[in-house]
Amino acid sequence: MAKTVNQHRKDIVEIGKRIYQLGYVAAFDGNISVRLENGNILCTPTAMSKGFMTEDDLVIVDSQGKAIEGKRKVSSEIDMHLLIYQLRRDVNGIVHAHPPCSTGYAAAGVPLQKAILAEVVLVLGCVPLTRYGTTGTSELTDAIREYVPNHDALLLA
């Protein structure tokens, strides 16, 4: 049985709290979304700590990124999520975080292409490093476009 929108809301809030507590996001970093059964996207808002969100803070957008439900402003990175959902019909949820170790690799220009941990290879495979794209612009979606069809995780430069 598919989850309800309310169940997805609870899940996103819980994931937000966990990634905040683990130090994978700070301040207003990161964003989370889920593709709903009707094709709309439930996502975190912009300018809000993922550790302190409530279910009412989440926003529903259509497939073009237009807000159709919710009081808050949509994440500036919604176009990145929409591109991933468009290119990957098998993807129904996205978590964009800033774990310190991953951020360090990205800042140093080092992709995670070597089999450092067996668990990472088994679950994610190669994690390529994209070129830099400014948040909320087509630079970002252009930077990830070539990698999305064949990778489940990306390091954003």
Predicted regions and their residues:
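Glycine-rich flexible loops
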Residues: M1-A157
